[in-house]
Amino acid sequence: MTFVINGEVWQVRLVPAGHHSLRRPNGSASVGCCDDRLKTIFIDRTLHGRFFLEVLAHEITHAAMFSYNIEMTYEQEELVANMIAKYGHEVLSIADSVFKKIKRGYY
């Protein structure tokens, strides 16, 4: 499946656990990886439920940072990706709710 961020087409590939695409640069294993060069997000196909959604959101956050040329240290990038993956839905849901109330004149 594919999606577009800032005009760049990305794809998501579900791969077997332990797949070489799930290796970090330091050689350690992961359950998700965002490859800017290939414009591909690789996710361990054994994931499911809320954890799968959080890993997907985390990796899409990396894709957005690459697509918008947002440069951070590794630690900063991971912090932002983790925050959005864990709490982004709640933040956007609240913002949407407040925005709708303001538009209707309830403020």
Each PLM stretch: what is its role?
Residues 1-51, 67-107:
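Metalloprotease/metallohydrolase-associated module, dominated by Zn2+-dependent proteases
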